[in-house]
Amino acid sequence: MPLLTGVALALVAVFGWQGWQKYQANQSHGASLVYQQLLEAALEPSGQPDVGKVSELANTLKNDFAGSHYAQYGSLFVAKVAVEAGKLDDAAAELQSIVDQPADDSLAELARQRLARVLAAQDKADAALKLLDGKVEPAFAASREELKGDLLVQLGRADDAHAAYEKAKAALSEDAAVGGLQMKLDDLAKGDA
């Protein structure tokens, strides 16, 4: 009898695992299809995204595939469309939702930097700067420091901005393009910032 119970439990485990794997694959495929539709709505050939459709599809991703990468990429597009429409509060809310519960560290940092730019556009550079405090992965160090420099320039803190731009430059690999960053440093040196 224990042998039959063991075999039955093993079969249940195997078939349960296979069922779970199939469910996960179907969920991923479904999210991928909705995300593809969102991309098509956001990147209309006319240059004008279908705002209503983008919002509807992003809500579908959030509701049906919550916490997935696709749902958060959808939120990034909603934020982009909101910025283009001048709805900075809506963009900030979308980005904040990713920062609060990111699907992974890369999405968290991407959303954090975009949110900082939105806050800066709302004349909230201090809040944006505070958002960028803390540890950062080396892959994002240069872009975060450059953004800090931009925010510090906006706040009129040229010396601190120069230091941030230097940190950004130091964080770049030797073969990275530093043209734009060097122009910002040169502008600060001339006092044009």
Task: Please tell me what each predicted stretch does.
Residues 84, 121, 154, 187-191:
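Register position in tetratricopeptide repeats
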Residues 137, 156-176:
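TPR/TPR-like (Sel1-like) alpha-helical repeat modules
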Residues 42-51, 59, 69-143:
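Alpha-helical adaptor scaffolds
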Residues 177-193:
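Extracytoplasmic/luminal low-complexity segments enriched in Pro/Gly and acidic/polar residues
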Residues 2-23:
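Single-pass alpha-helical transmembrane signal-anchor segments
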Residues 28-46:
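Short extracytoplasmic/periplasmic juxtamembrane "stem" segments immediately C-terminal to an N-terminal membrane anchor
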